[in-house]
Amino acid sequence: MHRESNSSAVLTDTASTYYRFTSTPKMPLLSVAIITHNEEANLARTLASVSWADEIIVVDSGSTDRTSEIARGFNARVIEHMWAGFAAQKNFALAQCTGDWVLSLDADEELSTELQFQMQSLLMSKPTADAFFLKRRNLFLGRWIKRGGFYPDPKLRLFRRTAANFVRTPQFEERPVHETIVFDGTAATLDYDLIHHAYPTLTNYIEHMDRYSSLGADLLVSRGRTSRSTLSFAFNVWLVPQLTFIWNYFFRLGLLDGREGLLLHLYHAIYTSWKYAKAWERARKASS
């Protein structure tokens, strides 16, 4: 049964004024869960946007930079945990949380000021929904990509940790990539943006493409989608990427996002080709 918090709002003086909640020490109102690995370039920005939360859990998988030091500077509880895959790592982080509500963030994301205000007001108002989607604003080379399917890019990130109307505790679906929350309950969408500082450089994005296309290939192999016939190989590796580019760049108006939009949709199409090609390569090696 949902516990009514005895939280009080206290106005604090910061560069971006916001309300801070204080709640009972044994049961924080809001827990923030973040997984990290060498995120010193991003983490301070992320933590600053949730510094008003009652509990911050950072699960780190062997960072060799200042990630843990930065996290502790924001009074986060840092837990070292060997890398087990995205979903497993995030589920471990969720298991450490003690708040009534959990906000799951990536280390390169931050809450906009407007979203901070809305989320704080929401948590004080006894919301009826069990989970909330956040509209994600993706930045590519510093530019907000508004079209082509990259916005509003809703992500379910805020949810009750446990509640009577959940059939099971919410958790991330076990899959190699693009993990999603699995839960039973009602969901709504908040109005303001979660800012995703995704790809500050082309080198960063190409490295991301290589890593995530490999994970995507693993998922395709697990589903038996390995382009075994010549026709399916040509369709997936050559035609699907072209259709993806045409659909997103022209029909979904990605062309209005300037040169950054052109580069992003071009490379996204290449990522699609790599994913299917790597799945075929894995199946080929397994059968030889």
Where are the model-predicted features located?
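Intrinsic-disorder-associated, low-complexity terminal segments enriched in Asp/Asn/His/Tyr and depleted
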Residues: H2, N6, D13, Y18-Y19
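Cell-envelope/extracellular polymer assembly enzymes that use nucleotide-activated donors
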Residues: L29-S31
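Short, well-formed alpha-helical segments that are part of the catalytic scaffolds
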Residues: I34-W52
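Acidic helix N-cap motif at the loop->helix transition within catalytic regions
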Residues: A44, D65-F74, E114-L115
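A conserved acidic beta->alpha catalytic loop
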Residues: S49, D60-I70, D106
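Conserved donor nucleotide-binding strand/loop of the catalytic core
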Residues: S68-Q96
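Catalytic-site signature of metal-activated, phosphate-bearing donor transferases
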Residues: N91-L94, L105, S112-A286
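Short aromatic/hydrophobic "clamp" motif used to bind/position activated sugar donors
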Residues: V102
